[in-house]
Curated annotation (Swiss-Prot):
GO terms for molecular function: small GTPase binding. The lineage of its organism: Eukaryota, Metazoa, Chordata, Craniata, Vertebrata. Residues 325-366, 616-645, 672-720, 734-835, 910-976, 1035-1095, 1291-1375, 1389-1493, 1510-1759, 1828-1847, 1906-1960 are annotated as: Disordered. Residues 692-707, 921-932, 1318-1336, 1392-1403, 1534-1546, 1561-1571, 1951-1960 have a biased composition (Basic and acidic residues). Residues 1939-1950 have a biased composition (Acidic residues). GO terms for cellular component: endosome. Residues 7-63 form the RabBD domain. This is Exophilin-5. The modification Phosphoserine is found at residues 799, 802, 1027, 1083, 1117, 1493, 1724, 1739, 1789, 1819. May act as Rab effector protein and play a role in vesicle trafficking.
Amino acid sequence: MTKVPQGFDFSFLNEEEARKILQVLERNEELRRAEKDRISKLQKTKRDIRWLQGATGEWFEEIQRKKFCNETDVNQMLKPPLTYRLQKGMAKNDPMELQTPRSKSLINQKPSVSSRMSFRSSFASLFSFRRPAKETLKLQSPRPNRCDERVRPSASVRGTASAKIYNSPVGNQPVASVFVPKPAIMREESGMPPPWDASLLESEFFQVLDDLDNKLAQEQSSGLMNTRVPFNYGSRTQFKLSHRNSHGHSTGRQQNYHSETSNMSIYNILRPGTPREGFKTFSPRTKTIYDMYRTREPRVLKEDFMQKNAFGSASLCFDSRQRSASPATGSFTARSLHFPADTQNKSSFTPVRHQQSPKRTPLSSIIWNRSDASRHRQNQEESLGVQAPMDIDPEEQYVSPRCFQESRRYEMCHSQNAYQSYPLNVPVANAMSPDTLENSENMPFYRQSNPFARSFFSSTFRQSREQRFGQNSFWSRQEEYSSWSDFPQSRGPFPSSDKDFEMFSVEANRAPSVCSQGVPSQHWRSHSSGHGTYVFRGREDSHCWRSDFQTSPLESMDTSHVNENQHPPHFVTPVGFSITDSSCHLQSSRLDSQQGYFPVEEAVDEDPYLCGKAQTPASSFRTPFPLSPDDGRESQSSSFPDSTATLQKIIPNKPDFLPIRNCTEVPVACSHSTDSLSLTDTQPNIPVTETNSEKDMDVSVSKDEQLNKTGQKSRPTGLPQYVLHTVISNDLPDFQNAHSRDSAQNDRYGFNAPATERSRRSPRVFSRKGTSQIHTTQRDQSNKLSKNKCFGGDRTLDSAASPPFIQESGTATSLPSPNQGCHQKTGSNEESSNTIKNSHWCFESTANQKSQPSREPALLDLEQSLSTHSTNDSKLAPGHSISRAPLHVASDAPQESFLDARLVPSTTVFSRSLSDQDPGQEQREEKDKATKSQDNQLAVNSTDNQESHDSPALPHDAVHCHPYSPFKNGRGKGRVRRRVSCIEKLTKTERAAAPTREGSGCAEDQRSIKDPELSTVYCTLPRKPASFLIHSRQQESKGTVASVRNGPLPFQIKNKAEVPTGKSTSDKPSSPESVSDAANAVSGTPKATKKMTDMKAIRSASVRKGPLPFLIKRAISCPSGEPCSLAESDDRQKSSVLGMDASPVIPRPGGRIFNSLEGEPSFRESAFSEKELAQEHTGKDRELRAPRMGLFNPSKKTPERLCATGSGKESGRALHKFKTTSMFSVSGDEENVNCLEVVSIYYTLPRKPSKKFCSLLQQYTQGTDSLRDAFQGETEALPNALEIDELNCPAQVQSGIPPPQDPKMQVDSAPCCLSHSPESKDVSQLPDRETSKSTLEEMTSVGPDVSLHREEPTTKEISPSNVSKTAIDDSLSREKREKELLRQILRAPLLHQEKGAGKEHTKSHQQPSKGGNSGPSGLPSRSEDNDENSQTRRDSGTCAGGMASGNGQYPWRDHMAAVVGDRSSRSQPRETSGTTGSDCQNPTDKMLSDSESQAFALTPALCKLQLAEEAQPGGAGLQSEASQAGSQETNTAEMRKVEDEEHMLTRDQTLLPRGNNKNKTNTDETKDRYSGKHRLAAISKASKRIPAKDLSPRKHVATIFSQSESESGFRRLSLYRPEDNPLSPEPTVKATESTDESSQMNVDKSETLLQETTVSSPGPPGQPCHQKSASILQPHLNGSPGVLETPPKSEGSKTQISGELGAPAQLTLTSPLEKGAGHQQRLSPPFPLEPTQKSTINSHCQLRHRSAPSPESEPEPHLYRSKSLKNFNVQSDLLCASHPPKARGRHFSENTSIDNALSQLSLEDGSFPNSGYNRRFKSSSELPASYESESWTSYSNRTRGPKSTSSISRPIDYGIFGKEQQLAFLENVKRSLTQGRLWKPSFLKNPGFLKDDVLNASNLSQSELVNSPAGQAPEDGVFPSEPLNIYKDDPVEPLVSDWDTDTTTDDEYYLDEKDKESEL
């Protein structure tokens, strides 16, 4: 074992690897010598030989010697018997065969085999025999197969091509003889002992297995490969990975799998179980089995090529590659080591296995992977000729394999959509391997989650591939296509960071792309329809597409390869990188396929342009603008050579245009090509192909594949996948059909028909993913525009605009693709963005700017409603908006239907959001093009993204990922990252921003500087959490600024459009007249306003873009629900016109909740739609009674006010501040983009006027809802339904409203998720505030002020806090004044109006709530409905009503909704909870106004309010209402105090009046513990990177509040176990899930319990309980912020307010209690009550979380984050969800984040304990999304609650901050300690010490108790659990404490802190 055979062959190893191995061997020899010396000395001295042997351990060696006569390897020793027997049997069977292939294989492996075997039989023998077996298989099978396949590119080619390509390097041996040579040669070469050559025996043994497998594979592959099943993606994913090595169709495949097995062999070698796992028997068996399944995989060929080329072989040995250039380097590399993981990933079981392989991983990944990977990358970069360890042989490389390799990689990526993170990195097969190896345990998500890994792999392997394949245009192109736009961009910018995100983009792109491309069905369909080609978008797109045309994928791919190499090579050659090449290739391929597909059977590869000629009429509309943009872009992309030649032809121009706008423009061409081609060819296949080319390929294929594949494989990924596959199912059939019909109809029919069809397709695309939707919408818009304008250029423009979205949408990865495609194609993000923007706007901007005056008025009438709504698509604005408007008008119902059918609410809405992101963006984009070009040159991506269609694409990517795309953007991060790669290079903020936009709205994503930053953060967007996180972040950035921009302009438009839309929407949102009226109103009346808003939009272009995605996302979450989804989708489409948005929502969702959801999102979307939202909500409530009326009147009223406030006030600051923040976020967060972005957003928001900030906050809240919707709509869309079911909430599941409620839940969740994003807190508060504000606004004519007021306190953290924080340094006092003024205004009219309106709405809501509880009004009864109702109620001032009505059921549901919609709806649930008390209805309204005033007063103390408001976000209004007088004044005074002294904040919050602040702070703190930790880390980084002014308040808030409040909270938790107990039940539930989730859940559960307690005693008892809860919760909230805040809101407005504002609430209810003895009384007197109630509620909640864990557990963390510190916690959740991309390094961090969103919703406890509690691998609390390392550990710490805070030890977090903050923190700590908060020592020293030890025991019992009561309580509404609660409170609290104070968390946190610091 120790002795190294003489002939050890390291040829399969890198030099470094071999060196390391040799070093190990040498050291082993030295050790053996030393041991022998020692033994010899002992032997000399010792008497007894036996004793001597026993002492020396020689006895074991002796036994081994006796056992195995040959002292070879342990592996050999272990294996010889079996191997020998097998050898005998094999010798009988295939003596010659075994020897021949072995010899052949050993020819390459000879030295390595012998050396290996000598080195270690386990390692070497397994490796050698495996590798030889693999090589043998590959060598023999590949050559004949390969030749055959090459020769025959038909169906056989597909099956055979894989083997052929793979085998081509091997190429010489027949398949039959493949197995023979290995054993003999192995024996000969390995130098193994003669008795039985372990290598030989193994080889022979596996030879037999291989023969069997080969035969099976051949049979299967011959039969099945030709009949690839498109939906075998789940299996094919793994199979794909398997196929990475198995290029031979059957034998090659199985051989490859053997190779993969050989790869696994490394792991097998590394660990004792090698014989079992290392044996080819198992792996090849698996391969055979998977081969059987693989036949389903239509991409075996592609897979093989891709795998082989991308990874050489997935297996360690990489026979074909190894044989070729550098077997030594190519065989045993990090990648090869990774490939066992990759290989495992290929097989479904393999990924798990790979994760199980960590035992081997250390050797493979640690020892070889990193160095080898780095060296590998260098080598690859250094010389193209030198094959990296995993590189493919040149043979394979330039044969079809590259295409297939990329395709296969892509396929693998997508097929592993469940492991989207993994597949995304897989796109670069090489990248995938190292990542796999790097994080074996995290392999599936590591690539995606680890930006660095991604970067490394992308860089290392893509560069290597570039070098390897750089010579081949096709490969570079294909590689780029594999990476999609990102690949081009990555390659353009450069592989290092670009590729990092390329990988992600591959993730993102590929997940959808792979879905579309990797889906065998599509592939096979592609044969007929060219869909399969698009299955492999970039790599295989043209090739496979042509192959599809030719029905011979391999041949087609080869031909395509050649042709593409001919055409794209021009691009590639000029580009050098495959940027343009890939873009061109992708686009060329696509266009070739798209345009050439119509002559499907023709030589499309070279004729695509000829085909384009044939399609010239169709192309003509594209040509006008695309030609010039194409030319410019192509020249930029250096696609111009081919592009020029192509440009000569219209369609070639289109492809050129496509190559130029890789994702954006190409899809445009594709879209129009589809339309044109559909028109020209009018073939459903062609439209499908075209659609596939542009959107179907991306969207339809992606959708279908994702739906189908995601259905199979996406479920592991979580909701993002679910969204994808939900969409896909519809999309492929429907979308294709719709596309075929739509394309034909659109082309044939004029504006209306395409609008209808397109809208249909758009919904499909939307449904398929936000991205798809946007693409469809854009296509529809561009088609409609073209037809509307009769303007080929414009249509092309829109087509270009649409296809980017389509492509971006089509591929989750596409999102970065547009950014990178557009930007990277251009070469630089800015230039590309500008180019895209200009190209876009060449036909769109020029059309927009030129024809916008004319077209906008004309189109605005129709489009205005949508234009305002579609302004978010401002990039596409005119065309897109126009398209959208007609689309909405013409096919509003169809879209609704499809959206509804789609059930991709967040995606659907999201796409629309992207489409209608900027109602005024068209106009604004004209200005913004210039202004934003300048402004966004800072955030080049942001500006360009905003202006370009990239922006819409980004969200699609994000959507796709998490949802998605993960999901949408479940994998969004990767996609974003790919897109961000260039952005990342420019700025990390931009990159992060891009992902956010990606998640939120690509259109806005690119408009917002936050986009790029978000891109980085959300690169995991394939993970849904990431997507929504990006959304959140993007919408935090975008939402903030965009809400201002959206608000005033959209608000005006909305108001004007809303009036018509109110009617139209109420009647039928789809009525063109309404849209036209709305558009006219928007276009006509708000023309000046629009100009103003445009100017303002230019300023806050990024901001403007953000909210719309929120709105859309919010709407999307509604679409997630059945009616809500459609309504909101349509509303989102008409989101610009809020009235339209809200009105349609009202009728469809069955009224108010929908409207509330929509109104809220719309209002949030509108910069100052708060008032309108409130009015809209009022209108909604009335619309329940009188649908149009409420919307109508408030709409008129609010617009002016909001416009004046938001437009006038906000226009000045929003953009600049926001941009700075954006930039900061980008630069701040590479890994922790979210956190930095959060800080950025915060700082950006403070830079905006408070009103604007409030408006932004509202929008952001809405966007948060939307984002949360997008994320949770995607991740929760399913989970929401699951939640609803799982929640056991009859009301929730009631009747038809549950779907709306579900959407609403998603909407709520979306805001919360959004809040979880960088501005998690702010967003968190924002939904609540916005609801509160909306309620106030709605309730009062002072609504805007009220809304602002409430929002200010509520948005204090987000909006006022950040807007005021923008003003905190510059307008803090002004905000204070504003707040006071608003408070005054609020107090008088708001209190009365809100009281009246609140009562009215409360009654409205209450009636529905009660009815909903009963079941008639499913909305309130449902948790989401309750959330929405509570939100609506809060919006409409019915905070108390809804909760009061549904107290028993509702509070629980509300809480559940809060939990389910935790991210977005937690705040709202809190508000709902707050609203729960009907007794407090009026007091709630009054308190709301008071609280608003108070919050307004608090606004000046934004830093303090930040956290305080986070505690108060949901209950800002409610809490304010509840604690209007004392809380108001106290809070105002306190907030001022806090503002004056940040440390005073903690003290103030400690004080009675600080109860609110404290609660907020505690909530914030807990969230800070969670998200605050990461956020603080990010903030600390931000403080280092952001101006102290901007950062300081926020950071201060985070630091102080997180620290002092966390400390105080922890102290309180320690002191007030009852509070902790409520948390404890939650932790009990979530402790399983995740300490992080536990804390959140505990808080949420506590809140829920309190809510339910309040429900039990909504009146004074509830309030006292709530006050107690608040008091306890405040302390407890410090530990678990969410608890305090949630219970107050749960308990009712008063209770919620008291809980939120603590003292004010208690002032209201128990004024002396909270006020006089604030904390002490809260500690003691309230404590018993509250603990009881809280415990009861917590038990209920916990049980609910457990009983309905999926809905409740997730919402609960969200509730916790959303409610108490919605910003922090929501941020945490959002960040976690979004950060999963970052957390991809975690095992399941990315997937877990998405899964967390999903799991919390659907799997909840079960998932969370595994996922969430799994070291809180960021997934549990979605914090993983926040930061990979930081979020992971920090999140765990935060999850740990007090300990997390303690472990954060605010000083540490603080240390990241400045000394100033540290001092403030210390002061806060001192104040907390001195002022009687929870004792500081336990908090500081070991928050977990007390809690773990003292609380742990009771924790378990409490947990159990809570579980049982919780199980009962969820149904009962927590009342039954109340007594238990008191009993359990103490145990529960320890649970929380324990959960909060996990030692691991502490360490993790510190590690994270270090990581953060290092990152900083």
